[in-house]
Swiss-Prot record:
The gene is glgA. The keyword Metal-binding does not apply. Pathway: Glycan biosynthesis; glycogen biosynthesis. It is an enzyme of class 2 (transferase). The keyword Transferase applies. This is Glycogen synthase.
Length: 510
């Protein structure tokens, strides 16, 4: 069996670094690829920055290379193994760039002003590894995730490394990594690529555009999103380029770690475990969640949860506007939130909690164990979104029998089965949640009210919970798709569609 060496390049991977779904998706994918999906032997190694505390988390760290001439200064590559999975990881260490309180933003929520250099350095490190470093075999495939790694395909292409194929996965097209064009030289972008058909867009360097332009193949994380991003409404200005790459663009849906998100064996539930065949402890999880968050201890309450970045994309503004009327109209309704994001939205949510003490609980920040307890104890998950590449959070909720009330966009169209009008006649069918159109408070209010009516019918509620908990959202099928894609890339001859300038990378000085 031929082994396909794959370098996975990303800004996040759980548990080393995580701010949202990207960290979960990267780690889940890499772990699943280690099980020889479809009989393909994939040897994955992860490349990511050595953020503050990351080096302390890996096992047996040792420096394996030193890299000079990177944007932001010299760095070292430290190899270690991730806790739990044993996954091999290369950490790019440059304390001046990465030893900071946050991954992307400072304590005030502002993005670091040198983020362009921080993630250009990551891409250059990937390109050096693709060239081959002493004692480190070059990969057959470099798999870059989102804008943070998206310069890697350009650099590999420009260096003439035609034997190394590149794959870019778009997790969120809205975040493109745009920076002033005058930084192009400092970022090590070759002169031949500094144009509107290359790395530039509207007089800015656009990391994600560069990746889409120069990657051998491009994937997105859901079928619906792959269709949506070809349109002006969802293409974020890149729909034309994506349509031009249409033959090389394909969806590979995400999965979730079903061992980590498993109510029957979750260590974060304090022994209150349950499954689709015996859900009695879910009520106990609700009582425990109410006590933990300061909600009224009512067994008859319906807990509506929200676990999300607090941004306009996630319709946090709409939820804030919709919730008062919902709480006033449904006296048994309670609301619990975990999230952080835009300061104005955080302030508005704190004010909502103060207005409805005992019925509204707001936890600003992210707490992984609490997130598990939130999904276990809630009845419904509110997950509005103006666009949604995939939507991992509804899948976590469904694993715990918490039914999502979500926008009918992106990946949620593929993963959530709405029972339709039949639910009003006490027929759950194959339903696993509730989808709604629109982005007005009234749209969200009507959807939540519809879900509350369904939950008031025990037979419907129980059937939908079982459907949700028994749905297969594992990485198995996705890992097979990626492994097959790697195999086709590794065996493919060099294509001549895009002329490749053979320019040197930044000096590989020690």
């Amino acid at each position: 069996m031929t082994t396909i060496r794959t370098l996975v390049v990303a800004a996040e991977a759980f548990p080393l670094a995580k701010t949202g779904g990207l960290g979960d998706a990267v780690s889940g994918m890499v772990q699943a690829l280690g099980h020889r999906p479809g009989g393909v032997d994939v040897q994955c190694e992860l490349l990511m920055p050595a953020y503050r505390g990351t080096l302390d988390m890996v096992y047996r760290p040792r420096t394996v290379a030193r890299l000079g001439g990177l944007p932001g200064g010299p760095a070292s590559l430290v190899r270690g193994h991730c806790p739990g999975s044993g996954l091999s990881v290369l950490l790019l260490r440059n304390d001046a760039l990465y030893d900071r309180p946050g991954i992307y933003v400072d304590d005030s929520g502002q993005g670091y002003p040198d983020n362009a250099r921080r993630y250009a350095a990551l891409a250059h490190a990937a390109a050096r590894l693709a060239q081959g470093l002493p004692g480190l075999r070059p990969p057959h495939v470099v798999h870059a995730h989102d804008w943070h790694a998206a310069l890697a395909p350009l650099l590999i292409h420009a260096a003439g490394l035609h034997y190394v194929k590149t794959l870019l996965t778009i997790h969120n097209l809205a975040f493109q990594g745009t920076f002033p064009a005058e930084l192009a030289s400092a970022l090590g972008i070759p002169l031949a690529c500094r144009h509107d058909d290359g790395a530039l867009s509207d007089d800015s360097v656009n990391f994600l555009k560069a990746g889409i332009r120069y990657a051998t193949r491009v994937t997105t994380v859901s079928r619906a999103y792959a269709r949506e991003i070809l349109t002006p409404a969802f293409g974020c200005g890149l729909h034309g380029l994506l349509r031009a790459r249409g033959a090389d663009l394909s969806p590979v849906p995400n999965g979730i770690d079903t061992a980590l998100w498993n109510p029957a064996a979750d260590p974060h539930l304090g022994g209150l475990r349950f499954d689709a065949l015996d859900m009695r402890n879910k009520a106990c999880c609700k009582a425990a969640l109410q006590a933990e968050l300061g909600l009224q201890p009512r067994a008859d309450a319906t807990v509506l949860a929200m676990g999300s970045r607090l941004t306009g994309q996630k319709m946090a503004d709409v939820a804030i506007a919709a919730l008062p009327a919902l709480l006033e109209a449904h006296e048994h309704l309670q609301f619990a939130l975990i999230g952080r994001g835009e300061p104005a939205l955080e302030t508005a949510l704190r004010a909502l909690a103060a207005r409805y003490p005992g019925r509204c609980a707001v936890h600003i920040g992210y707490d992984e164990p609490l997130a598990h307890r939130l999904h276990a104890g809630a009845d419904l998950l509110l997950h509005g979104s103006r666009f949604e590449p995939f939507g991992l959070t509804p899948l976590y909720a469904m694993r715990y029998g918490t039914l999502p009330v979500a926008s009918r966009v992106g990946g949620m169209v593929d993963t959530i089965r709405d029972p339709g009008p039949a639910v009003e006649e006490s027929c759950a069918g194959q339903g696993t949640g509730f989808l709604f159109d629109g982005s007005e408070p009234a749209d969200m209010q009507l959807a939540v009210a519809r879900a509350l009516r369904a939950l008031a019918k025990p037979a419907v509620c129980d059937a939908m919970r079982r459907n949700a908990m028994q749905a297969d959202f594992s990485w198995r099928a996705s890992a097979q798709a990626y492994a097959g894609l790697y195999a086709s890339l590794a065996s493919a001859p060099q294509r001549g569609r895009v002329p490749a300038p053979t320019l040197p990378l930044l000096a590989n000085a020690a």
